[in-house]
Amino acid sequence: MINQNPKGGTELQFDYLTKYVDNKLLSEVQICTSVPEKIPLHPTKVNILWQKNSYDQSNLYPWFKNKDNHKKYDWYVFNSHWTYEKFRNHFGIPEDRSVVIKNGIDGIQKSASYQKGQPIKIIHQNTPWRGLSILLGAMQLVKNPLITCDVYSSTEVYGKNFYEKNDHHYKGLYDQAKRLPNVNYIGYKPNSYIKDNLHKYNMYVYPSIFEETFCISLLESMAAGLYCITTNYGALFETGAEFPMYIPYESNYRNLAQKFAMGIEAAANTLHEEQIHNHLECQSAYAQAYYGWNKIGTSWKRFIEGAVNAKK
């Protein structure tokens, strides 16, 4: 059965917000996510635009370009410093009414340390236009027989309507994934399934060619203690800090695929080393400590309390 309703990062984070912040406090504000005025502005409550989309997306760029619109919201909340800087530089948004509260994680089990000679399992759980073609190109070049990659890539994460309109564009990529001997194409699974199974993997590989404003799949993989390989495109370097192996983004995708193949092989050769084990322990602790929703929820609580009191 096709997933009926969108359940991407925006929806997941909103669910966490309602889980970790008191509903009575949330009832004092109106939060609109990403697309301005997709829900009407409230006449009396504090209006907050929680911005997670990129500055250049067509469904919001014209609204932000018109500075008369900026006064409509009491506060703008951005999911990364990268996102805030892009909106500030491109649109001159009100700096005194802007805050950064990053996305968070919840309920991530850590994987066991990899031991030499074990199978090496890679997970890729990103939508197909964000780099699946690069990943498949890289996997064709990977020769280590221990390495396999499970691909959970589909447009279904954004609901039935989006899936029916768009998924056929990527059938060729899905078919290619199914043909590769070291790739298992699985398709859509809900985030709850991904989180429950992350600890069974050793590596997360995301050759992103999409300007992420944050990256929840990277953060969850870091928390699970997976060795992460990604580009430095968009806000990925902010999400990952110093922990992933970063392959510098380039528009020559053939070169990028070759570099990712080399990165995967190099990482696989060192996964068993104590230094890498310690690195991944530190990575997991960092992600859990700074991005757990118990901490993120506290940031939201304090922000909303202040915003409500300021309007009284």
Language-model segments: residues:
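N-terminal pre-catalytic "stem/leader" segment of glycosyltransferase-like enzymes
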Residues: 1-41
